[in-house]
Amino acid sequence: MKKNFHLVIGNPIAIAHGEVGDDAWGHTQFPAAFHTVNGKILVSWEWCDDTIEYKGNVHSAVSCDGGNSWGEPAAEDRISYPKMSNGKCFAGFFKKGAHPVSYFDQYIPAYTSEACGKRYFAKEIREKQDTTVYGIEADPVTGETELFECKINWPYMPIGVTASGMVYPSTMVFCLSQRCGLLMSGEKMYFSLYFHGFNSDAASRKEALLPYMDKYCVYIFESCDCGRTGNYLSQIPTNEEVIQSNPNAEGFCEPMMARLPDGSISILLRTGSNDPSFIARSTDDCRTWTKPKVFDSNGVLPQILTLKNGITLASYGRPILKVRATSDPSGMEWDAPIILPLTESTDPKENEKPWGKKQQSCFYTGLLPLSDHTALLTYSDFHYPNSDGIQVKSIMARKITVVFDE
């Protein structure tokens, strides 16, 4: 049953500021929010060039007052990760950036394109250093971490080599799921990821090429042992509707899932930098999905979160920042989006910056529940003034509160 409600959006709160004049793409961007083991909030963000090599420079800040003020994290301010069957915590998948290789030259690719390079079936590659997926387990007391090898059951699992000869390791493909597609549900963990992959539902190798091989495809996995084993469940390949709207679209990618009040699972999907976002629904725990339909006219890394009061929130953007909500238990009917204004640049040379056009944010957001009725939204604002009044790239937060109408 739908409920009448409205959202109260709090004022912007600055978490951290970048350096004056640092306009490099990837610096002071891509915030994510977490709870810590000691009851605080931790927000992390990237400070490195946004490349497939992934140099991995992550900064963070913590709040002990619900997001009102922020400071440097201490050693004990560790992220609260899900427990594994061995008593350790699952801290995600190991990040290993793309790197040059030559050993793939001895293999015949299953697919080659100028746009996306070469695709191979991972099981046919004898060398395992780039096809192996590694998880990270953390000691719940000390926080010390170590790697473990994941057993991945994925029909026609892909591995790709770019046109410049860089292999994109399988463990990095799975690493993407912890930022945009990890869902805990009881004793099970579902993770969704995306890649220029194959048709994992194909009856044979010869039938494993998808209609749009140069577009991303979303794949969903289930783990009953908190990440040690990943079993393929389903896929959401790019469809004709996406191609018709924009032949240059990236395809379905950056998936984010949430369990809805009626027990179903909704998934939000990006299709491009300034292209529509889509939504699909599963009523059988990710084994099948409804045909994706347009969610909004934009949406990179769309976030979705169901609060304990039954209201589901979404945040997304590019070229504008939006928040949306629904009381529909199935998550299929949403209220109109709310546009959140960002700081306008006062720099007359804004259009000459590295990204080539005026842009106010990376528009990658994070959503974290604070209570039954409140969530924390994190985002970047490229022109927010620092303590000296100088506009710099900044990591920001705003509280979203659900108020039920009488």
Locations of the language-model features?
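Asp-box/BNR beta-propeller blade signature and adjacent active/binding-site loops
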Residues: M1-E406
